[in-house]
From Swiss-Prot:
Residues 1-18 form the signal peptide. It is found in: Secreted. Pfam families: Colipase (PF01114), Colipase_C (PF02740). This is Colipase. Forms a 1:1 stoichiometric complex with pancreatic lipase. GO terms for molecular function: enzyme activator activity; lipase binding. Disulfide bonds join C35-C46, C41-C57, C45-C79, C67-C87, C81-C105. The gene is Clps. Residues 19-23 form a propeptide. GO terms for biological process: digestion; lipid catabolic process; response to bacterium; retinoid metabolic process. Keywords: Digestion, Disulfide bond, Lipid degradation, Lipid metabolism, Secreted, Signal.
Length: 113
């Protein structure tokens, strides 16, 4: 019995020591990796081009790029804007459900001047 416990402990230590670094398998995913939800991505944007397309982590939208203000499902057709930008566009309940509320990323500080 003691030998089994020692073997189990050694096995657990070996698995814990061999665990990958900061690059994740389920969370902390880099751009281009397959994702199921935006919370898995370092960039916080999991995007797919079509409803049947494979979703991948990608960078957030830059200024004057198409964007989605929010998603109900955690996967975007267009990523939200980078920090400091706002997604200006039409918003509707149907668009929120179908994930088609698109806009353009604008710098609100620059547009007020």
């Amino acid at each position: 019995m003691e030998k089994v416990l020692v073997l189990l402990l050694v096995s657990l230590l070996a698995v814990a020591y061999a665990a990958p670094g900061p690059r994740g398998l389920i969370i902390n995913l880099e751009d281009g990796e397959i994702c199921l939800n935006s919370m898995q991505c370092k960039s916080r944007c999991c995007q797919h081009d079509t409803i049947l397309g494979i979703a991948r982590c990608t960078h957030k939208a830059m200024e004057n790029s198409e964007c989605s203000p929010k998603t109900l499902y955690g996967i975007y057709y267009r990523c939200p804007c980078e920090r400091g930008l706002t997604c200006e566009g039409d918003r509707s309940i149907i668009g929120a459900i179908t994930n088609t509320n698109y806009g353009i990323c604008l710098d609100s500080r620059r547009s007020k001047q």
